[in-house]
Amino acid sequence: MDCLSQFRATLDNYRTHGWQLARVLMTTKTLEALRRETATDETRAKVDDGDAGLKFENVAARESELDAMWFRRASSGGREAWELRLAAEPYALFEMFEADEAEEDREDVRREMEARARMKNEG
């Protein structure tokens, strides 16, 4: 199964369980596949201007060392659950954020989770 198909299959599974796609991380190779898939005749004729504007399921795709997706959903007590899921294998990291937790603190935790996933992906 190609990587974009893996992304779609994983996304379908998470949506079934009430998760919302929040962020998309793609390797250069996967971004290129997405670019080819979404290109129109007009955009094929243009000079490549990077990955600005590339979207997967209406979510901006960011270049990364990982092929992964961030999912989120509401949880009890006003909390919010976030999960980072690798696209190609059944590996995910989960974090529950309190309602009053600062966005800066949440972002720090998400960066740490991405670093852990990169380590897993390399090993």
Task: List each language-model region with its residue ranges.
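Structural motif
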Residues: L25-K29
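Phosphate-interacting basic helix/loop segments used at nucleotide- and nucleic-acid interfaces
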Residues: D2-Y14
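Short, surface-exposed beta-edge/turn micro-motifs
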Residues: W19-R23
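Detector for the mature cores of small, proteolytically processed
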Residues: L34-G123
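Exposed alpha-helical structural elements
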Residues: Q6-A9, T30-A33, D108
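A generic structural signal for short, solvent-exposed coil/turn residues
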Residues: T16-G18, D48
